[in-house]
Amino acid sequence: SGNTIYFGEGSWLTVV
C-alpha cells in the first residue's frame, strides 16, 4: 500500500 510505480511515458500505478 502507498507504493507508486512509474512505467514511463507518464504512466503511473499507485497501489493502495
Swiss-Prot record:
* Gene Ontology BP term (one): adaptive immune response
Q: Does the keyword Membrane apply?
A: yes
UniProt subcellular location: Cell membrane
Ordered alphabetically, the record's keywords are:
Adaptive immunity, Cell membrane, Immunity, Membrane, Receptor, T cell receptor
Q: May I have one GO cellular component term? A: T cell receptor complex
| Keyword Protein biosynthesis on entry | no
Q: What does this protein do?
A: J region of the variable domain of T cell receptor (TR) beta chain that participates in the antigen recognition. Alpha-beta T cell receptors are antigen specific receptors which are essential to the immune response and are present on the cell surface of T lymphocytes. Recognize peptide-major histocompatibility (MH) (pMH) complexes that are displayed by antigen presenting cells (APC), a prerequisite for efficient T cell adaptive immunity against pathogens.
Could you give the subunit structure recorded for this chain?
A: Alpha-beta TR is a heterodimer composed of an alpha and beta chain; disulfide-linked. The alpha-beta TR is associated with the transmembrane signaling CD3 coreceptor proteins to form the TR-CD3 (TcR or TCR). The assembly of alpha-beta TR heterodimers with CD3 occurs in the endoplasmic reticulum where a single alpha-beta TR heterodimer associates with one CD3D-CD3E heterodimer, one CD3G-CD3E heterodimer and one CD247 homodimer forming a stable octameric structure. CD3D-CD3E and CD3G-CD3E heterodimers preferentially associate with TR alpha and TR beta chains, respectively.
Q: What name appears for this protein in its UniProt entry?
A: T cell receptor beta joining 1-3
Organism from which the protein derives = Homo sapiens (Human)
Query: What gene is this protein a product of?
Result: TRBJ1-3
